[in-house]
Amino acid sequence: MLFTSHIFNCLLCCLLFLPQSRDTLPSGSARAMILEKPSRSGGCLHAYEPLDTLFSSTPDGYEPFYISHFGRHGSRYAGSKEDFSVIDELMKYSSRNHADSQKSSVDPASNSMEAAESRKVTLSETGEQLLSDLIALKEYSEGKYGQLTEKGAREHRNISRRMCSHYPQVFSNPERKRVIAVSTTSGRAIASKENFLSQLALNAPDREVSSYTARDTLEYPAAVLATSGYPMSKEVRRNERFPDTSESTARLMKGFDSRRLRSLLFVSNCNDSILATNGRDTALGHVTSLSKSSLADSIDDSIFIRIQFSGRHYECIGDTLVPNFEKYFTVEELYYLWTVETLIWYAHSCACEGADHTRMHYYGAGILKTIIDEADSAIAGNSVAANLRFSHDTYLYPLLALMGVEGADYQGPAIGALDRVIDFTNVCTAGNVQLIFYKKQAAQANQPDVLVKILKNEKEVLIPSLAPSAGCYYDWQDLKNYFIQRIAVF
């Protein structure tokens, strides 16, 4: 949640000086995906999209015996009331606020200059509806900030159910009855784990489940390393180095034209001539649609990113009573707002040129080391069928980047990541990576003892820089050596 807030602050900085010229909307896979489903513009708050994936055939002579899983918590409520701070900003322009001030014993003339100016600009009918929708979303979230929603609980129950369905051999082996599950101490991560395990108990009732949090280091020494990697000191955090994405953002955001939103959400209550959205000076009368000129200049473009940031929490709730906020934006506007966030995610968490890759080194390496060690123990013959880890996007993204999996493997300037490293395909709510281990059932000459395939959000993926043994299956020794090399490099 802290990193999400940091991204939000970066977004606001990037939007302070947006140019107002419109460019042609770029083509590309991310744009096409958002066009297909606008809610994907929510980035890390986009809800999990289960896929009815057709898995590759299991290689002859092999059978799955062990699963290593690392997942983000499911859909959650907004982190705090600060996620709805834009409501206070919009209230300055709301007719309900002006009516309240008239009823007040305080002389309206004594109000601040800011309040007086806001009365010259008010919310349109659509703007008032938007404000009502935001208030409704905030009220729906109060008392539940940061908690897992029922939608998030379903996401993890369904992932658990599909895991048991796809790999019944793993959860029916009498010699491997143990399942070890661990989460961070966050309530939403714990609740995600509990929902996953409740479904597992229905589908594989004879498994012996050990459930831990990161506090339980006496019972499970790797509890912290498995869920959040190596701890970062305050000094390390202070000295993290990230490339400046503001120039790239400024170029991208030329396509974001706030005039339509200004005209949609605000009106000017004056006799001034206001620049119309078609760019011509037009006397529009006493009440005019608002565009970026005259009184409209008092409204900063950052208010629109605040609206989108607050409104996108609706998808995590999944209740029909909660309004859909995408109706206020065009797909183009959603796309451009999304590009800023995904660039910041890449610059901070992945193998971005100019970064020191601190999060890959601390978070990613610690988790990946645990994955390797626990897999080797399972291969050596312990009784564990699955290691399940429940954590956060802050740790999942660096892990995926360090592993070099398809869709998170790009190394280069941030601007090149737009269609290569897409946040809603990597760290959506309940996002996960699973390593499925297959053991050779009989002696076969020149065949690896253990094969592994990698799933990202339950879809088979490759590591572009490492050749598989066959299809999407890797020789575990090759994959392990590759991971160890990546840890050493980063």
Regions found by a protein language model. Give the residues of each.
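Signature for phosphate-centric chemistry
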Residues: 23-180, 184-387, 391-490
